[in-house]
């Protein structure tokens, strides 16, 4: 994610220095093995049993939102792993599970914690050795804390990203058989790590999201993918990241059909009272705000009124988020709703690369919004 942030150069430099030192002193490790496939029935049983006896809590209060930025938090978590400060990582994971803190805008810290650990820090283009380093460090964490669910979930997240690295970004017909073997092997390793975590006492909401990422990479059928979502939402109903993961699964270029995401957003949000319903609608529909042709094609069938209400409720309850404002601006611009677009652009500090193709597209949309 290419965003500016206020972390000091020295902190980031120290992180990369630790990475370079570790890579220089460790031998090359090969993680690619052939695994026997775990039956889907076994996996679904683990999914159902994971939340058994779990007490569902009310949504986190807006008062849990902190002014700490996502970028600084992500950097700090990455540095702790590079320093092998596993004790502090355990404390953070426990705090995320019990206190359920949010960033301003409503983003769960727990989600960012595992995102930070799943993707290796690097300079320049990501290399295979970067993933090997990250996996090696997380494996040491697992060894030091064998009862840690956070360590095993982090390992799974790293392997799903490592699978994507093996596949590359080309279309399916450009991926070699060797790349597919690595992709499937690493996704299977991620699943094994999650099944191992399920046998531990600790329960973490991100376990389900990590399993959703496995389901996406293994191409689970819609019935099993939806069953996974339903079990996840039953465990932690306000962890909206589950719904965004499932929305990704439903995109027409993957496993869904045109119109599936707007229909899902309406179905999921309509079962909730306000303001939770419109907020969830905003969370799901905003996954389409990425300036990609298949996603943009889905937007005309969504409710701009409900989307706008959801954005306003998120901002009122959880505070202003530059990312949320960019998503709102993109959808308003797509609908040619000039007043809403103008309002959104007026509050945006920086362009979010996850939303816009680039500065030219962003500036053109902003110029349009600001014309009489």
Identify the residue ranges that each predicted region occupies.
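Intrinsically disordered, low-complexity segments enriched in Gly and acidic/Ser/Thr residues
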Residues: 289-343
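Short coil/linker segments at helix-helix boundaries
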Residues: 87-147, 157-273, 279-309, 347-372
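N-terminal secretory signal peptides that target proteins for export/translocation
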Residues: 1-9
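Bacterial signal peptide processing site
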Residues: 29-30
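N-terminal mature-domain "stem" immediately C-terminal to a signal peptide or N-terminal signal-anchor/transmembrane
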Residues: 37-102
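Bacterial N-terminal signal peptides
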Residues: 13-26
């Amino acid at each position: 994610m290419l965003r500016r942030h206020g972390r000091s150069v020295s902190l980031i430099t120290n992180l990369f220095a630790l990475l370079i030192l570790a890579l220089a002193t460790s031998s090359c490790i090969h993680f690619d093995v052939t695994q026997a496939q775990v039956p889907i029935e076994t996996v679904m049983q683990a999914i159902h049993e994971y939340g058994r006896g779990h007490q569902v809590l009310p949504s986190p209060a807006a008062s849990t939102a902190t002014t700490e930025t996502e970028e600084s938090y992500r950097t700090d978590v990455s540095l702790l792993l590079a320093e092998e400060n596993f004790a502090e990582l355990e404390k953070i994971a426990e705090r995320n599970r019990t206190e359920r803190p949010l960033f301003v805008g409503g983003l769960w810290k727990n989600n960012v914690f595992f995102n930070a650990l799943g993707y290796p820090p690097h300079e320049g283009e990501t290399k295979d050795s970067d993933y090997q380093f990250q996996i090696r460090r997380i494996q040491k964490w697992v060894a030091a804390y064998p009862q840690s669910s956070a360590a095993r979930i982090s390992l799974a997240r790293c392997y799903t990203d490592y699978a994507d690295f093996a596949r590359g970004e080309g279309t399916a017909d450009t991926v070699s058989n060797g790349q597919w073997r690595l992709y499937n092997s690493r996704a299977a390793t991620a699943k094994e790590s999650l099944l191992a975590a399920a046998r531990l006492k600790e329960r973490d909401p991100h376990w389900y999201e990590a399993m959703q990422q496995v389901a996406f990479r293994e191409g689970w059928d819609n019935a099993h993918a939806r069953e996974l979502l339903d079990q996840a939402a039953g465990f932690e109903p306000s962890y909206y990241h589950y719904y965004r993961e499932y929305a990704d699964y439903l995109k027409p270029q993957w496993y869904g059909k045109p119109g599936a995401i707007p229909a899902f957003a309406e179905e999921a949000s309509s079962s909730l009272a306000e303001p939770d319903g419109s907020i969830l609608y905003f969370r799901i529909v905003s996954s389409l705000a990425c300036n990609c042709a298949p996603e943009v094609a889905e937007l005309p069938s969504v409710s701009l009124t409900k989307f706008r209400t959801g954005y306003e409720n998120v901002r009122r309850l959880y505070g202003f988020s530059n990312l949320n404002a960019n998503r709102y601006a993109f959808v308003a611009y797509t609908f040619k709703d000039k007043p809403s677009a103008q309002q959104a652009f007026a509050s945006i500090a920086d362009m979010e690369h996850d939303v816009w193709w680039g500065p030219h597209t962003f500036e053109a949309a902003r110029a349009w919004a600001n014309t009489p």
